[in-house]
Amino acid sequence: MTNIRKSHPLMKIVNHSLIDLPAPSNISAWWNFGSLLGLCLGIQIITGLFLAMHYTSDTLTAFSSVTHICRDVNYGWIIRYLHANGASMFFICLFLHVGRGIYYGSYTYSETWNIGILLLFAVMATAFMGYVLPWGQMSFWGATVITNLLSAIPYIGTDLVQWIWGGFSVDKATLTRFFAFHFILPFIIAALVMVHLLFLHETGSNNPTGIISDADKIPFHPYYTIKDALGFLLLTALLLTLVLFSPDLLGDPDNYTPANPLNTPPHIKPEWYFLFAYAILRSIPNKLGGVLALVLSIAILAVMPLLHTSKQRSMMFRPISQCLFWVLVADLLTLTWIGGQPVEHPFIIIGQLASFLYFSLILILMPTCSLIENKLLKW
């Protein structure tokens, strides 16, 4: 008799994805972030569901409903902080996951990579709308500033912004629709994750060497299930440490002040994980140019498979490319720092140089460097 996990229609899918899946024998801890992202999504959906049971999406009661969750609901405070800090963990894992893809050349699986970029956009949209829901000062002004950027689109811009707002300013209609979208998007993300995995399992995983590993595969279970379980344990420990010891470390104090359309905060800035893109947006003096740069800062990832000029897939044996990769990492950290600073000298010029370097590295320096390394192979 055939084993039920190999014959049952539903169990068969799970078996081929998580148990009998042939995996490269040498994938490192950098390959753990895919499963960690799945864990983050699960945590966000569960905590978000419980928060939605007590939250009211009305401008008059939204702020006090969040206060009510923290003060009166059983363990409401931990659910709220798990959700808020879970988003930070989500983005840490996302950035590391994308960084791994760039370093080891995983972007050459272009379908998987492109679905990943769509996922990144979807998660960023979800996080932005979620930040608006508590209806604090930074929620309101963040929503006003970011949605206002769409007015830079020629001809239809102003109408588009008012259509999104549902009126002539960010108000009750905006909050209600943002709540609706914030609730539905994680389920769309979950569906996209399935497509992402479908395409990944068509080709199989890449590995640190970038060399085809068909000759040396091991079953996913027990080797990588145990490895993922360790990752889960470490991520959960880190998240709980953050939630239980310094839950407001990554938040903005302004968001503990109820939204007031008549009082603008001195420094409007998004959550830390958007600061790099915000710095790129601010580095361009023109409004439309800034919006384009903002979108391109993520969309530029889509051209990476086209700009892969190296004869080797991974950067493991390419020291010059490795240097440029770490310059890119340092540049993104610089942009993140600049995004949180006021718009004044010397931060303006640092932001402009860092933005220029970001696009130059991806579009010009890294592909050129790969060509030089190809020449060095022949020496």
Swiss-Prot record:
A ubiquinone binds at residue 201. Gene3D superfamilies: Cytochrome Bc1 Complex, Chain C. Pfam families: Cytochrom_B_C (PF00032), Cytochrome_B (PF00033). Heme b b566 binds at residues 97, 196. PROSITE patterns: CYTB_CTER, CYTB_NTER. InterPro entries: Cyt_b/b6_C, Cyt_b/b6_C_sf, Cyt_b/b6_N, Cytb/b6-like_sf, Cytochrome_b, Cytochrome_b_C_euk/bac, Cytochrome_b_N_euk/bac, Di-haem_cyt_TM. It is a multi-pass membrane protein. One of its GO terms (cellular component) is mitochondrial inner membrane. Its main location: mitochondrion. Coiled coil: none annotated. GO terms for molecular function: metal ion binding; ubiquinol-cytochrome-c reductase activity. One of its GO terms (biological process) is mitochondrial electron transport, ubiquinol to cytochrome c. Keywords: Electron transport, Heme, Iron, Membrane, Metal-binding, Mitochondrion, Mitochondrion inner membrane, Respiratory chain, Transmembrane, Transmembrane helix, Transport, Ubiquinone. The chain crosses the membrane at residues 33-53, 77-98, 113-133, 178-198, 226-246, 288-308, 320-340, 347-367. Binds 2 heme b groups non-covalently. It comes from the Eukaryota. It is found in: Mitochondrion inner membrane. Heme b b562 binds at residues 83, 182. Component of the ubiquinol-cytochrome c reductase complex (complex III or cytochrome b-c1 complex) that is part of the mitochondrial respiratory chain. The b-c1 complex mediates electron transfer from ubiquinol to cytochrome c. Contributes to the generation of a proton gradient across the mitochondrial membrane that is then used for ATP synthesis. Heme 1 (or BL or b562) is low-potential and absorbs at about 562 nm, and heme 2 (or BH or b566) is high-potential and absorbs at about 566 nm. Belongs to the cytochrome b family. This is Cytochrome b. The lineage of its organism: Eukaryota, Metazoa, Chordata, Craniata, Vertebrata.
